[in-house]
A protein has these predicted regions:
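Thiol/selenol-based redox catalytic cores and closely related redox-interacting motifs
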Residues: 33-117
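Local sequence-structure signature of Cys/Sec-based thiol-disulfide redox active-site neighborhoods
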Residues: 1-22, 26-31
Length: 117
């Protein structure tokens, strides 16, 4: 299982602690230094079944500075995925990629269900 995190994000730290407490092994990846590629994002988005907007860090500074709240609705899915691939800070975190699930953000109820804890 891969977990993409930003170490200065308190939610990410909380999520990693949760995984450790539940003895769930994972491979940590720094989302800012090694942002997801277009190909990865497209695969994860398809696998997730989630709306693409769930992959955006809507509370982030870059999202707000770029005015994406108003721009996304006029962009194709392909354009949105390419945009997400330009900067890991645009991506909702933590982003968890399991064998049969993809999770955005940390909601322990969703994590318990997905990871069968």
């Amino acid at each position: 299982m891969k977990v993409l995190v930003y170490r200065k994000c308190s939610t990410c730290i909380k999520a990693l602690k949760w995984l450790d407490e539940h003895n769930i092994s994972y491979e940590e990846r720094a989302i800012k230094e090694e942002n997801p590629t277009y190909e990865e994002l497209k695969e994860w988005y398809t696998k997730s079944g989630l709306p693409l907007k769930k992959f955006f860090n809507t509370g982030g500074m870059i999202y707000k500075e770029m005015g994406l709240k108003d721009k996304l609705k006029d962009m194709s899915e392909d354009e949105q995925l390419k945009l997400l691939a330009t900067d890991g800070m645009l991506v909702k975190r933590p982003l968890v990629i399991g064998d049969d699930f993809v999770l955005t953000g940390f909601k322990d109820k969703e994590w318990i269900e997905a990871m069968h804890v």
